Amino acid sequence: VVDLSHMHHKLHAACAFYRSGFETATAVIVDGAGTFIPLNMERGENHMVFELETIFDCKYPFEIKTLYKHLGGNGPYRSGYDLEMSSEQYDESGTHECIITDGAGITKVYEAVTNYCGFQAIEAGKTMGLFPYGKPNKGIPPLFTDAGGEWTCANRHVTIPTYPNSSRINEDRFKFLRTPKDKKWGVDDLTVLENRRDLAYAVQTETQQQVLNLILDAVERTGNKNVVLSGGYGLNCVANYFYLDELNKHGIKLYAEPISSDAGTAIGAAYIAHHQITNSEKVLPFADSLYLGPSYAYDDKEIGHLADTYGATLEK
C-alpha cells in the first residue's frame, strides 16, 4: 500500500494534467480542504492548516512541481505572506511560495453561502443554479479583501471558517443578511428570500473572479499558457465558461477536469505511480470520455431471457 494522502492537491493536478492532452501545463487547484498539515505557529502553538489553492508546473514524465500554495485554518493566528516553504513533504526538492491565513479559502466561501441558502455544503451546484436569480446588492459586504493590496483573502467578518468541514456566513453582523424573525424557524425554502438570491449572485461572481486572477497569476509564474483546472471548485461549470471567455483574450488554453471531485485523486495517484514506474514520456491523448469503468451491453434476447427467468413481461 502506498499512502499519497500527504499530496492531495498534487493528485488532483496529476489527474487533470495526464487527461488534458497537453505535453506541459500550468495546474491550478482550488479546493475546500486538501491535505491536513500540522504547523507549529507563533508562541509554539500547534495549528492544523489545510491546502486551499495551489499552483503547479507540470511536465512529462512525472514532474509536477509545486510553485505556490495557500494554506488556511480556523485560527486565530497571524497570517504569513511570501513564505518559502520546503517542498519535501510533497516528495519534491526545493521550496515553494506559501501564504498562510486564518480565513476561508475560495471554495469554503462558496460552501458557506451554500449553507446560508439552506443547502448542504456539498450541494454547491444548487447555489450555482440560484445565482442567476440574484442581482448586485450594496447591502452585501465584499466577500474578499485585498489585504493592503499584496494578496487577497476571504473577509473573515463575513465568512467564519469551520475547517475541515464547511464554513458559516456571519449573517447577524450585517443587516441585509439577517433572516427575518418570522422566517428563521419556519420557512421551508430559504431561496425565496432576496438576501439568499443576492448572496448567491455575489459568491458566484466574486469567487470566479478570484479563480480567474489565480489562473492569470499562475500563467505569469510558469510562462505556460496551457492550463488545467481541478479541485472541488473545478466543478463550477458556470465559472468554467466564464474562464473560457476571459482566458481566450490572453491566448490561454483551458482544460477543466470533469472529475474534479476527490474521486479524481485516485485517478491522479494511479497516473503518478504509472509514470514513476514506466518513466514514459508518451503524451497521453485528450480524455474525451468520463466512462473509465467496465462496459456492459445487453441485447433484446438477453433481456427476454431474464424476463422469462423471473416471470416478467417484456414490453418494448
Language model feature labels by segment:
Residues 1-316:
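Short acidic/glycine-rich loops and adjacent helix/strand connectors
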